[in-house]
Every structure is written in structure tokens, then in C-alpha cells.
Amino acid sequence: SVEQTSSEQTAQYKSTLVSGDSLIDLTGGFGVDDYYFSKKIKSVIHCEINTELSDIVAHNFKLLDAKNISCIQGDSSKTLEKLNQKFDWMYIDPSRRNDAKGKVFMLKDCLPNVPDLLDFYFKYSENILIKTAPILDISAGLLELKCVKTIHIVALENEVKELLWEISK
């Protein structure tokens, strides 16, 4: 959603945290992060469940001449199973909206439910970068996630914008 869209500055910062040949973004959204990842990674896959948004982003990437980004519309877990390949990095920006609960802040309440899917994700990548809301309790996040290597607190003009969780198997 628009309110979760990364700014150019935060997307550029995220791109400095990854390296290698391949990255899959399981929660593609508007693709701002993927555009910057594509400057550092040879092949980026933008996976977005919303058909209309996926089409718009694919069109925008063509206009931006971002030839190393592929757009796949569909459920990210099914996409991982279908592709059945290892990635150097996986990026996840879970939706912090829940139909039943409204706006949520615990990782287990987000979509996808990263804590429940972590073992599944590790089958496809040993390095995972997760973006969360700055209001997420870091202690709670550490309890929900395993293998946390680094937590980045990203701020612009003295305002915390997001937390980035580097997780390695």
C-alpha cells in the first residue's frame, strides 16, 4: 500500500545491505526497493499478489529500463515453490494491515506471517531482509524471529521510518 512505500533514500540505503546475483522480493508493492536493489543485484524478482499493482509496476520498470527485474503476479509462497531455486537474498515487507485487526504491529499479525514461514523461507535463501514498522517492539521482534544478525533503525531528518532486520541461516 502507499503508506508502506519506501522513500528513495531508504530504498537506496537498503540496497547497500545486499549483494550477490539474485534477490526475490516476496511483497513487491510499488517496487521502489526493487528498483534500487536492481542496481546492486544481477537479477531481481518482484512478486506481488495484487494483479493490477503488479501490472503497473511491470510497466514502470519498462519505462525505467530496469531490464534485470522480473515481475511475477501471485502468492509469494506458491511462487517460491514453483520457481524452486535458491536466492542470495530474500526481501519481505509484510503488510501491516489485517482485515480483522486493522493496523497491526506484531510480526505474527502481518501478512505474510514471517515468524511462521521462516523455516520455509530458509529453504530458498540463507539471507533475509525484513522491513517492519518503526513502532515494532524490538524485544518482541527478537523473540518472534530467529537468527537475527543485525537490526538497522532507519531514520530521515530525525524521524525513524523503518526497522530492517537482517536474518541469516
Residue ranges and their predicted role:
Residues 1-169:
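SAM-dependent transferase fold signal centered on methyltransferase-like domains
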